[in-house]
From Swiss-Prot:
Belongs to the MurCDEF family. Keywords: ATP-binding, Cell cycle, Cell division, Cell shape, Cell wall biogenesis/degradation, Cytoplasm, Ligase, Nucleotide-binding, Peptidoglycan synthesis. It catalyses: UDP-N-acetyl-alpha-D-muramate + L-alanine + ATP = UDP-N-acetyl-alpha-D-muramoyl-L-alanine + ADP + phosphate + H(+). The lineage of its organism: Bacteria, Pseudomonadati, Pseudomonadota, Gammaproteobacteria, Alteromonadales. This is UDP-N-acetylmuramate--L-alanine ligase. It comes from Shewanella oneidensis (strain ATCC 700550 / JCM 31522 / CIP 106686 / LMG 19005 / NCIMB 14063 / MR-1). One of its GO terms (cellular component) is cytoplasm. It is an enzyme of class 6 (ligase). It comes from the Bacteria. GO terms for biological process: cell division; cell wall organization; peptidoglycan biosynthetic process; regulation of cell shape. Cell wall formation.
């Protein structure tokens, strides 16, 4: 039975779904939206979508047969049976207005993901940090075990060459997005919570208690026979555990974890540790990712796999051979500067805790290298809300190149931009950051800043990732001709 035939069989269980043939995505170029669109294309739906710019996601969807419109317009939705929107889309978007006038159902991304999960064994991964890596690790473990899951991930899984794929089994492994509380639409069999911190607080009215309660509600979407896999190292997770009335499996470095990491060590890009599980033999593991935070992500994957009775041999092999995720401590090789070769790492982390974890991993793996960070803050609201935390963590590198805020559609907030943050870090007195007005200007500064043997870390969720790829490909005009090793 082909994948499409398998899904048509599932659709026959819901006769009403036969009415839905054409699905249009507004904002299809995002990783989450594009991933769901890719699964639906492969399930046999006629998929179209629009976005303001062409990117790798839209290019891939075109190759798969989706019709992509660059730019938004009312004509794009005329033939749609349903319109899927991301929360980043303005309600006054002409396609949304047209869909309302035509009485075409409009659903959020998470609602469509929930429909994909409805007749599958869903594994949903939530948390402030680590969702993409944890989801990727779980998908890799299940794939290694021959379970062939469907997955939807917020980043490129390097081994698959995509962030989403339609599998032939009953499993669906997906990120659960708390940024707009839409993860409450999901009804999985297994839920993972990696950690809980203050982020996207506008969604929750600035009320951290409301955010915590929403995570509890998310876990209570599990059936009574479902499993909540949670990180006991996180203090907020420990705080909400007494409120969770589902079966709980904990993981972490703590002695009271059900799935515990011991004997941690890191050398370069790889970590070694022992995992101890109740009622199971200890496993000595190699993880092809750096940092203690990634060991925690691996523990979550191990906990899920163990609950589903996946063989230990698949766990061992999948972790050792894991090829990583795009923009998650992605080693892009070395590139040449006038003063010598520099190691280049690109990372998506944009919350102070994520940046701190990345710095810690870089220090542990390459202690001899000078750490130069080019950081692009993401969103004015996040910069404002976590301003002091950003000052603290960004002061920990050896050299800081600070770009202006990537707005992600937000209006500027006085005192929460890159220049203000740069001044505040300078006043702290640990280092003298260099303000970079635009990503394009970064190339002009780097030759004077970088030294032989440096580790350059490009950090942030905005468009700085595209710049790092150009650096890796020696496209910025200051290469001395040394060989550049670009890793996927």
């Amino acid at each position: 039975m082909t994948k499409t035939e398998r899904y048509l069989q599932l659709r026959s269980m819901i006769p009403e779904m036969r009415r839905i043939k054409r699905i249009h995505f507004v904002g299809i170029g995002g990783a989450g939206m594009g991933g769901i669109a890719e699964v639906l294309v492969n399930e046999g739906y006629v998929v179209s979508g629009s976005d303001i710019a062409q990117n790798a996601v839209t290019d891939r969807l075109c190759l798969l047969g989706a019709k992509i419109h660059i730019g938004h317009g009312a004509d794009n939705v005329q033939q749609a049976d349903v319109v899927v929107v991301s929360t980043a889309i303005n309600p006054q978007n002409p396609e949304i207005i047209a869909a309302k006038e035509l009485r075409i159902p409009i659903v959020r991304r998470a609602e469509m993901l929930a429909e994909l999960m409805r007749y599958r064994h869903g594994v949903a991964i939530a948390g402030t940090h680590g969702k993409t890596t944890t989801t990727s690790l779980i998908a890799s473990l299940y794939g290694q075990a021959g379970r062939d899951p469907t997955f939807v991930i917020g980043g490129l899984l390097n081994s698959a060459g995509t962030n989403a794929r339609l599998g032939t089994s009953r499993y669906l492994i997906a990120e659960a997005d708390e940024s707009d509380a839409s993860f409450l639409h999901l009804q999985p069999m297994v839920s993972v919570v990696t950690n809980i911190e203050a982020d996207h607080m506008d969604t929750y009215g600035g009320d951290f208690e409301k955010l915590k309660s929403t995570f509890v509600d998310f876990l209570h979407n599990l059936p009574f026979y479902g499993v909540a896999v949670v990180c006991i190292d996180d203090p907020v997770v420990r705080e909400i555990m007494p409120r969770i009335s589902r079966h709980i499996v904990t993981y972490g470095f703590r002695d009271d974890a059900d799935v515990q990491a011991l004997n941690f060590s890191q050398q370069g890009h790889q970590c070694r540790f022992t995992v101890r599980r109740k009622g199971k033999e200890d496993l000595d593991l190699l993880l092809n990712l750096p940092g203690q935070h990634n060991v925690l992500n691996a523990l979550a994957a191990i906990a899920v796999a163990t609950e589903d009775e996946i063989d230990d041999s698949a766990i061992i092999q999948a972790l050792a051979e894991f090829q990583g995720i795009g923009r998650r401590f992605q080693h892009l090789g070395k590139f040449a500067t006038p003063k010598g070769e520099v190691m280049l790492v690109d990372d998506y982390g944009h919350h102070p805790s994520e940046v701190a974890a990345t710095i810690k991993a870089a220090r542990a793996g390459w202690p001899e290298k000078r750490l130069v960070m080019a950081y692009q803050p993401h969103r004015y609201t996040r910069t404002r809300d976590l301003y002091e935390d950003f000052i603290e963590v960004l002061s920990q590198v050896d050299c800081l190149l600070l770009l202006d805020v990537y707005s992600a559609g937000e209006a500027p907030i006085p005192g929460a931009d890159g220049r203000a943050l740069c001044r505040s870090i300078r006043l702290r007195g640990q280092l003298d950051p260099i303000f970079i007005a635009s990503p394009e200007q970064l190339a002009e500064v780097l030759p004077d800043v970088l030294q032989e043997g440096d580790l350059l870390l490009t950090q942030g969720a905005g468009n700085i990732g595209a710049l790092s790829r150009k650096l890796a490909a020696s496209e910025l005009g200051f290469s001395t001709g040394a060989t550049t090793e670009v890793k996927p």
